[in-house]
């Protein structure tokens, strides 16, 4: 993404699809411009931010207002041609300066509240995901300098109504929308063109001389590889939901080692032989966990608790409480077995490894020691 212009379209079946930007980018831009306005004490009508993917956005500011040491500003969400429930709505930020030296971030009207475990945010907190939290706080800190403090409130008056058209309630996020986005950019997810762009990245890596590749579902996997494995992320390629397709492409290109790295919420599906991990295609996460826990001799009580969970992260808490953390090594081995079964007709199949990690970047399990895998990747 960082190598492509934001204005460059995504092509699908001869049609140019326009990119958009996330609610996280809107909240970041709104917070930044509100902080600048309260400092300068004059209205600002346009603001620029650099997204986590390195793309610079120049956005129009709506409803700017200053009152003493407080300012409010809004950015209108634009989903491009990947229009979702939040497209066109205003995301507001209210910034109030203080002398605390600290930045506090809260969610106001129309921002959902987390009511269930399993999405990586504390119960009762605003549904502002980790990457947007970081970008909002960084943008405000850059604006106000190192000594001042600020209270930042993100709100969206249409949020509660718009959220009814999302999956938030199923995830235990109630009362509004989520502020999300790991890259800051919305790319139209036309499947074939998206798959081709991912495959093209594999081709570029192979052409550069790489023979070992790390496939991750998204940005969190790349961050884990960098921070916890100490491996050059040059070998990392995003596979999105297209696990089987990307494995087959890696084999076609002659990679000798494929390492699958991700959260169990995605990779556990591979253990069940599901190689397209989008929930619209198949979702057997709890069933797969229950089956493999049973194979390891887990009690019926644990099987019932896990079977009733809505998210893998929530199930993991029960698994830890019952002392069955060794299931993750078991699942990693099963994932590799499923991959090798898929490639059973391949003349020279690659080495396959799998590493599972938690939302807080801790290693949960692997088919063999992670240090051993990392050492091979550095060869």
Curated annotation (Swiss-Prot):
Keywords: Cobalamin biosynthesis, Methyltransferase, S-adenosyl-L-methionine, Transferase
Pathway where this protein functions: Cofactor biosynthesis; adenosylcobalamin biosynthesis; cob(II)yrinate a,c-diamide from sirohydrochlorin (anaerobic route): step 6/10
Pfam families: CbiD
Superkingdom, natural source: Bacteria
Enzyme class: transferase
Reaction(s) catalysed (UniProt annotation): Co-precorrin-5B + S-adenosyl-L-methionine = Co-precorrin-6A + S-adenosyl-L-homocysteine
MF GO annotations: cobalt-precorrin-5B C1-methyltransferase activity
A biological-process GO annotation: methylation
EC number: 2.1.1.195
Family affiliation: Belongs to the CbiD family.
Name the record gives this protein: Cobalt-precorrin-5B C(1)-methyltransferase
Gene from which the chain derives: cbiD
């Amino acid at each position: 993404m960082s190598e492509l212009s934001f204005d460059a379209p995504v092509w699908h079946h001869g049609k140019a699809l326009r990119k958009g930007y996330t609610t996280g980018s809107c909240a970041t831009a709104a917070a930044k411009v509100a902080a600048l306005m309260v400092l300068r004490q004059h209205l600002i009508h346009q603001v620029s931010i650099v997204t986590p993917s390195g793309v610079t956005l120049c956005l129009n500011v709506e409803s700017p207002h200053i009152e003493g040491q407080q300012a409010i500003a809004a950015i209108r969400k634009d989903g491009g041609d990947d229009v979702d429930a939040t497209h066109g709505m205003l995301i507001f930020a209210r910034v109030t300066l203080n002398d605390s030296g600290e930045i506090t971030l809260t969610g106001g009207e129309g921002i959902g509240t987390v009511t269930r475990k399993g999405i990586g945010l504390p119960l009762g907190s605003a549904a502002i995901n980790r990457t947007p939290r970081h970008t909002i706080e960084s943008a405000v800190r850059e604006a106000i300098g190192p000594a001042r403090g600020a209270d930042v409130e993100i709100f969206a008056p249409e949020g509660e109504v718009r959220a009814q058209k999302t999956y938030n309630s199923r995830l235990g996020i109630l009362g509004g929308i989520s502020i999300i986005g790991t890259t800051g950019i919305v790319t139209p997810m036309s499947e074939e063109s998206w798959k081709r762009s991912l495959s093209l990245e594999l081709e570029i890596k192979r052409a550069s001389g790489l023979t070992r590749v790390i496939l991750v579902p998204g940005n969190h996997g790349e961050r884990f590889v960098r921070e916890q494995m100490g491996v050059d992320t040059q070998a990392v390629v995003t596979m999105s939901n297209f696990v089987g397709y990307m494995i087959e492409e890696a084999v076609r290109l002659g990679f000798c080692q494929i390492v699958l790295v991700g959260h169990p919420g995605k990779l556990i599906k591979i253990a069940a032989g599901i190689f397209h991990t989008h929930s619209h295609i198949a979702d057997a996460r709890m069933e797969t966990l229950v089956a493999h826990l049973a194979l390891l001799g887990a009690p019926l009580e644990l099987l019932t608790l896990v079977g009733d969970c809505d998210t893998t992260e929530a199930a993991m808490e029960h698994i830890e409480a019952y002392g069955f953390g060794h299931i993750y090594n078991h699942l990693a081995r099963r994932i590799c077995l499923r991959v090798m079964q898929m490639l059973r007709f391949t003349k020279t199949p690659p080495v396959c490894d799998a590493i599972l990690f938690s939302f807080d970047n801790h290693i949960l399990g692997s088919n063999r020691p992670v240090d051993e895998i990392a050492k091979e990747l550095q060869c």
